[in-house]
């Protein structure tokens, strides 16, 4: 595990009101890699009593954000897709694992898998990142 990747994740998390509001926790970090978790609450359920797709997207997007900023170079999403494969329910602990597939000078491609506590895939997300200049902690 990269100490630098953890530093960058903690620096971002300090200002990440959305991740905090959703109860997202950072579990593991490395360069181009992040694992985050979230427990589905009653407030996250849709009219079918399953986890709202927007909440799943936010979990995957958070893992993506930490992975694509793990090297300390500021990056944002330029495009994202998600496939919902099975529902999450209240009380489920969902884990999103993000891995870099390609990182160029400016753009990157990251795949994120969300699994439930039975290790069954809930959603697959692909994010494309774009480096915007600047650094996360003031040093790259």
UniProtKB/Swiss-Prot annotation:
Pfam families linked to this entry: 4HBT
Family of the protein in this entry: Belongs to the thioesterase PaaI family.
Entry keyword Hydrolase: yes
Annotated signal peptide: none
Protein role: Thioesterase with a preference for ring-hydroxylated phenylacetyl-CoA esters. Hydrolyzes 3,4-dihydroxyphenylacetyl-CoA, 3-hydroxyphenylacetyl-CoA and 4-hydroxyphenylacetyl-CoA. Inactive towards 4-hydroxybenzoyl-CoA and 4-hydroxyphenacyl-CoA.
Biological process terms in GO annotation: phenylacetate catabolic process
Induction pattern: Activated by cAMP receptor protein (CRP), integration host factor (IHF) and by phenylacetyl-coenzyme A (PA-CoA) that prevents PaaX from binding its target sequences. Inhibited by PaaX.
Subunit structure: Homotetramer.
Protein name per UniProt: Acyl-coenzyme A thioesterase PaaI
Effect in UniProt of substituting residue 46 to A: Reduces activity 1000-fold
pH effect summary: Optimum pH is 7.5-9.
Keyword Hydrolase: yes
Gene Ontology molecular function: acyl-CoA hydrolase activity
EC number: 3.1.2.-
Enzyme kind, highest EC tier: hydrolase
Pathway assigned in UniProt: Aromatic compound metabolism; phenylacetate degradation
Keyword annotations of the record: Hydrolase
InterPro entries reported for this sequence: Acyl-CoA_thioesterase_PaaI, HotDog_dom_sf, PaaD, PAAI_dom, Thioestr_dom
């Amino acid at each position: 595990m990269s100490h630098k990747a953890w530093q960058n994740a903690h620096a971002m998390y300090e200002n990440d009101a959305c991740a905090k509001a959703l109860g997202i926790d950072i579990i593991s970090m490395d360069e181009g890699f992040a694992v985050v978790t979230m427990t589905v609450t009653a407030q996250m359920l849709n009219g079918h009593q399953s986890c709202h797709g927007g909440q799943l997207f936010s979990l995957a997007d958070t893992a993506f954000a930490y992975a694509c900023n793990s090297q300390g170079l500021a990056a944002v999403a330029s495009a994202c897709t998600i496939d919902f494969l099975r529902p999450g329910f209240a009380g489920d602990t969902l884990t999103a694992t993000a891995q870099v597939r390609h990182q160029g000078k400016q753009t990157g491609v990251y795949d994120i898998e969300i699994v439930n506590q039975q290790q069954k895939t809930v959603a697959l997300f692909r994010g494309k990142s774009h480096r915007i200049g600047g650094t996360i902690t003031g040093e790259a």
